[in-house]
UniProtKB/Swiss-Prot annotation:
SUPFAM superfamilies: YajQ-like. GO terms for molecular function: nucleotide binding. Belongs to the YajQ family. Signal peptide: none annotated. It comes from Streptomyces griseus subsp. griseus (strain JCM 4626 / CBS 651.72 / NBRC 13350 / KCC S-0626 / ISP 5235). Keywords: Nucleotide-binding. This is Nucleotide-binding protein SGR_2909. Nucleotide-binding protein. Gene3D superfamilies: 3.30.70.860, YajQ-like, domain 2. InterPro entries: DUF520 (IPR007551), UPF0234-like_C (IPR035571), UPF0234_N (IPR035570), YajQ-like_sf (IPR036183). CDD domains: YajQ_like.
Length: 162
């Protein structure tokens, strides 16, 4: 019988992020407490730019955006938001969407699988993802349950289950 496998990835659908951003922008434009504050959220290249005329307001914009991401099923571990910075009369927050598993994080995950996972399960780093293979599908499901119970500082998805 051939080996079964799945990939561990950290990916975010850009369209879902765009939808969350548009929903947040619409809510900001309609809320009474944001009238006249210059609060906005938009794409700035690959970054997301949030701005308002007060530090509390720009943090509130970030909070709204985070709530929209959660509603769209995107993990907040994928969002890397900076600190509010004063720029002229406005405060700005730049945020990026983190994708891919770094080499050191992939090694940590592989070590957890080796140490705590079932015997006979192999984990190989392939670029920014991790391939886990075994002869038994039950072992692969046990590895998935093990990894879901871990608290990583990056989002984890399982794809290509074969």
């Amino acid at each position: 019988m051939a080996d079964s496998s799945f990939d561990i990835v950290s990916k975010v659908e850009r369209q879902e992020v765009d939808n969350a951003l548009n929903q947040a922008a619409k809510e900001i434009s309609q809320r009474y407490d944001f009238k006249g504050t210059g609060a906005s959220i938009s794409w700035s290249g690959e970054k997301i730019l949030m701005e308002a005329n007060g530090e509390e307001r720009v943090k509130a914009v970030l909070d709204i955006f985070q709530s929209k991401l959660i509603k769209r099923g995107i993990s907040l571990k994928s969002l890397d938001a900076g600190e509010p910075q004063l720029s002229g009369k406005e405060y700005k927050i730049f945020a990026t969407i983190e994708e891919g598993i770094s080499q050191e994080n992939a090694k940590k995950v592989a070590k957890i699988i080796r140490d705590e996972g079932p015997k006979g399960v192999k984990a190989q780093v392939q670029g920014d993802e991790l391939r886990v293979s075994s002869k038994s599908r039950d072992d692969l499901q046990a590895v998935q349950a093990l990894l879901k119970g871990q608290d990583f500082d990056f989002a984890v998805q399982f794809v290509n289950y074969r």
